[in-house]
């Protein structure tokens, strides 16, 4: 089996060369299995045996009977809200064999489930933008397109990142990677680019950006300081503020320091961010004079008070007054996924329906440990007072919370609370190891599917390349068989098999393009034979252009119909951690109140794998030493700790500890450590550190605020020291532990 790039992709990802590794038996779930203790005692088993007890093989029919029996038992005894349908995962970009969607489709047919809202990638940001911009399209790829920015912007301020590293992938797949093309056009035009980030590599070096190595979690203060300087010098666009915003008087009063006596100026911002006041003041003078675009990566809102940088960026853009003009304004998430900012589909993307929901039970996605540890406990979300459901059954398909959740030691404790945990996955992830029932799903190269989404200009055929390994079945086949056990197969499959559904989903997109956009896509046979079909797309898009021209005729879906800079809704709610205007609120952990020796840990996306996927492929292994991921340290921070490049180090705080390999580089700001996510959770057998370099044993598991409840992974202080002794190879240790609990 070989791999070659898509012919229409100008900058294909190197990750495609890791795809054949999916066909390897290494760490694959090869047959249905049940934890020994659970098989003996079912819901009364010792739940601390998860991850420790041996698995026993069972037939597919027996496994499906057990799963169907648990769904029926929990539904009858505790109600369907006691079933948690996992969150989501990147197990496949296929839109038909989309494991999470198919699980929820099946469960909706038998009474429903508790689900989730928002994502680990982005939660606080969309919540605040829904109330201040009326929707979250600006962070989902429908702000100014990159082609418009490349042709019209004169000053580009990148808060966080705009990196091809994080733009390699896209939910639903991506046909063409456009980011590098537009970045090179930006360079060609001589656009001034400023990168505000603790990591210099968050833009390619050939962009030659000015690097502003900001303290993590302080971007809000910089945005407020820039806006305050513009207002202080009288260069704000008063006409735009009057016509297109509401509550601006509250926001402007805060910038002037009328409430707290401290104007938000360059000196104030400098003391918080660590950036020179002179540079802040100079940039504040330049932004209104040039066509200026602000971009904010999703990473900024994965922090305590993560709503604030998204709202503060909107406030700064409103003060500058270029929202709705080509190459001006603000946008979110460029580079966070491959399709954000690219020409976006205006047609219908292929997608399976979850069907209607019999119950509306959900949690904010990153509050899973809170839910499991505090059944019935109160919490707030988006202005509503809610209570956590009492979860008895967890069914997780195609996801790995022991990768993407925070404070994994706390999650490990929470994981002992449900009566039964079912995991359906191709791989024996750390989550699958901690299941009661494990069902082997096929990978995307072992079945037919199609890919496509709102941020891609193609629908792609995904033809089966190899036979499924072992006894693996496709997600559709698993849920179809399970639906039969539950008596809802006809409603689940609607009389279609795999290829019948793929044809149906494609034809829906094709007919929509023809009917609504007079765009001709090839018939299904041609599409399947050539492997792709173009979609109708919007190019050279300027976000909010019509609104700027006539706000009355094109109102936003906000409390005022305008951009909200002072919110009556948030004023009424009275949250201390998310007030009525953009504001600097100290995070729970940051360098401004660090103890001696503490560093700020950032856990960003890895280069050599997709989150925790493709962990065993060569590209991922090449970024490890002794099976451990590398943590980036500034030379000064390494020197004072006696740490050499390539040395094993221990990172720790009150929440946990892990080992990693030191990578000493001046590309990271002093006081900051950067350890990528996705290493497979490998706790030591005895009390000791996690061995693979998984940063989520260290990260903070609190909501961004009572309003947004997003994850706060980037609010994290740690200590680092050289590790003495031989810790062994983490990859081999994981494999040895897995072998010990699998059937012989």
Curated annotation (Swiss-Prot):
InterPro entries on file: Asp_de-COase-like_dom_sf, BisC, MoPterin_dinucl-bd_dom, Mopterin_OxRdtase, Mopterin_OxRdtase_prok_CS, Prok_Mopterin_Oxidored
Superkingdom of the source species: Bacteria
GO cellular component: outer membrane-bounded periplasmic space
Membrane-crossing residue ranges in chain numbering: none
Range of residues in the leader sequence: none
Function: This enzyme may serve as a scavenger, allowing the cell to utilize biotin sulfoxide as a biotin source. It reduces a spontaneous oxidation product of biotin, D-biotin D-sulfoxide (BSO or BDS), back to biotin.
Record-stated family: Belongs to the prokaryotic molybdopterin-containing oxidoreductase family.
Name by which UniProt lists this protein: Biotin sulfoxide reductase
């Amino acid at each position: 089996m070989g791999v070659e790039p898509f012919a229409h992709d100008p900058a294909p990802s190197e990750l495609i060369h890791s795809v054949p590794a999916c066909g390897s038996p290494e760490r694959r779930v090869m047959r249905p299995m049940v934890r020994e203790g659970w098989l003996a005692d079912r819901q009364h088993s010792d739940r601390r045996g998860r991850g420790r007890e041996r698995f026993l093989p069972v037939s597919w029919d027996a496994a499906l009977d057990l799963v169907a029996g648990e769904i029926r038992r929990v539904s009858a005894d505790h109600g369907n809200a006691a079933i948690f349908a996992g969150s989501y995962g990147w197990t496949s970009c296929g839109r038909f064999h989309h494991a999470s969607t198919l699980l929820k489709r099946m469960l909706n047919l038998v009474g429903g489930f508790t689900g989730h809202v928002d994502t680990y990638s982005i939660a606080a940001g969309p919540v605040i933008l829904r109330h201040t911009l009326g929707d979250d399209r600006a962070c989902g790829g429908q702000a100014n397109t990159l082609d418009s920015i490349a042709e019209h912007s004169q000053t580009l301020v990148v808060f966080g990142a705009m990196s091809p590293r994080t733009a390699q992938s896209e939910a639903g797949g991506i046909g063409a990677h456009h980011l590098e093309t537009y970045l090179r056009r930006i360079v060609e035009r001589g656009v001034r680019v400023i990168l505000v980030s603790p990591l210099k590599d968050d833009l390619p070096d050939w962009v030659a950006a000015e690097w502003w190595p900001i303290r993590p979690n302080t971007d809000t203060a910089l945005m407020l300081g820039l806006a305050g300087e513009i207002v202080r010098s009288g260069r704000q666009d008063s006409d735009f503020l009057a016509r297109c915003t509401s509550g601006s008087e509250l926001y402007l009063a805060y910038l002037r320091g009328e409430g707290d006596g401290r104007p938000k100026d360059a000196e104030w911002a400098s003391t918080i961010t660590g950036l020179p006041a002179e540079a802040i003041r100079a940039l504040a003078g330049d932004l209104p004079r040039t066509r200026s675009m602000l971009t904010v990566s999703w990473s900024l809102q994965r922090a305590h008070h993560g709503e604030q940088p998204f709202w503060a960026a909107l406030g700064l853009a409103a003060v500058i007054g270029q929202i709705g003009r080509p190459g001006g304004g603000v946008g979110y998430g460029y580079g966070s996924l491959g399709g954000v900012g690219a020409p976006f589909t205006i047609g219908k993307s292929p997608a399976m329906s979850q069907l209607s929901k019999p119950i509306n039970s959900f949690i904010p996605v990153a509050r899973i440990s809170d839910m499991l540890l505090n059944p019935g406990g109160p919490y707030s979300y988006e202005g509503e007072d809610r209570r956590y459901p009492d979860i008895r059954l967890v069914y997780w398909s195609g996801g790995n919370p022991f990768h993407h959740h925070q404070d994994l030691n706390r999650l490990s404790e929470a994981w002992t609370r449900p009566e039964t945990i079912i995991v359906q996955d191709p791989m024996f992830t750390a989550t699958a190891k901690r299941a009661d029932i494990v069902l082997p799903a096929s990978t995307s190269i072992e079945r037919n599917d199609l890919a496509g989404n709102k941020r891609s200009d193609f629908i792609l055929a995904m033809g089966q390349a190899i036979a499924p390994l072992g006894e693996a079945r496709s997600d559709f086949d698993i849920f179809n068989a399970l639906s039969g056990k539950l008596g809802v197969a006809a409603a689940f499959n609607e009389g279609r098999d795999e290829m019948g559904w793929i044809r149906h989903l494609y034809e829906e997109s094709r007919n929509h393009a023809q009917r609504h956009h007079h765009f001709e896509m090839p018939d299904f046979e041609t599409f399947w034979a050539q492997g792709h079909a173009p979609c109708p797309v919007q190019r050279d898009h300027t976000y909010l252009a019509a609104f700027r021209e006539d706000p009355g005729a094109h109102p936003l879906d906000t409390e005022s119909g305008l951009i909200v800079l002072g919110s009556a809704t948030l004023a009424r709610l009275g949250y201390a951690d998310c007030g009525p205007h953009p504001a600097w609120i100290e995070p729970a952990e940051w360098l401004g109140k660090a103890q001696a020796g503490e560093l700020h840990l950032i856990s960003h996306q890895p280069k050599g794998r997709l989150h925790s996927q493709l962990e065993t492929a060569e590209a991922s292994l090449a970024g490890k030493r002794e099976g451990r991921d590398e943590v980036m340290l500034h030379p000064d921070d390494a020197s004072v700790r006696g740490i050499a490049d390539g040395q094993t180090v221990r990172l720790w705080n009150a929440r946990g500890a892990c080992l990693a390999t030191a990578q000493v580089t001046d590309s990271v700001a002093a006081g900051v450590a950067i350890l990528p996510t996705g290493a497979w959770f490998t706790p030591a057998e005895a009390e000791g550190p996690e061995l693979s370099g998984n940063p989520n044993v260290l990260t903070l598991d609190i909501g961004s605020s009572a309003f947004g409840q997003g994850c706060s992974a980037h609010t994290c202080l740690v200590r680092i020291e050289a590790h003495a002794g031989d810790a062994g190879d983490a990859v081999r240790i994981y494999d040895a532990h897995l072998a010990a609990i699998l059937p012989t």
